[in-house]
């Protein structure tokens, strides 16, 4: 089994010639390699809808973790319920931070997402994912190379130094148009915020719509140097 500790530059490759551009093959490999010791960390963005549909074909009882920061859009929570109805066998876990919003405010002040967004993300996303991955050998992410400069070198199989794990990224070769084409073809549910200018959807406090021609992640932490929550730093 390929693990963080036994990592070596691997020659695992998947054909990009099929409809899924290697995604289905990557997922099949991942679940065969790690069996029950792998989890999909899903934010329920549109890429997530594609991955959930593919994962359901490979492993209908797969573990899926949603990092519930308690400040997501209502539309996101409603989408999760629709996904549960569409894929009832998937094991969707809504992972909570250890601190409630009130406890966080008492310790660090009100609106931490404004005063110190890195600390807020650490408390409400990074630490919960660390806990979720503690007993796993690998995790799945919906990163695409097209999304941003920080993601353009992502591989199918990655050594993840942040969480000392293996990160599997099946959608690296997909374009934004291909994601939507797949969603429409298979009549998948998706967050209606995508229809009103939100290409990337995170917490309600830190996500704004993006103007025409903008980068897909321009609406995340707008006005701040921060462009990533920290889950995908190497």
UniProtKB/Swiss-Prot annotation:
GO terms under biological process: cysteine biosynthetic process; hydrogen sulfide biosynthetic process; sulfate assimilation, phosphoadenylyl sulfate reduction by phosphoadenylyl-sulfate reductase (thioredoxin)
Cofactor binding, per record: Binds 1 [4Fe-4S] cluster per subunit.
GO cellular component: cytoplasm
Highest taxon listed in the record's lineage: Bacteria
Catalytic reaction equation(s): [thioredoxin]-disulfide + sulfite + AMP + 2 H(+) = adenosine 5'-phosphosulfate + [thioredoxin]-dithiol
Keywords, in A-Z order: Cytoplasm, Iron, Iron-sulfur, Metal-binding, Oxidoreductase
UniProt feature coiled coil, ranges: none
Protein name: Adenosine 5'-phosphosulfate reductase
Organism whose genome encodes this protein: Bacillus cereus (strain Q1)
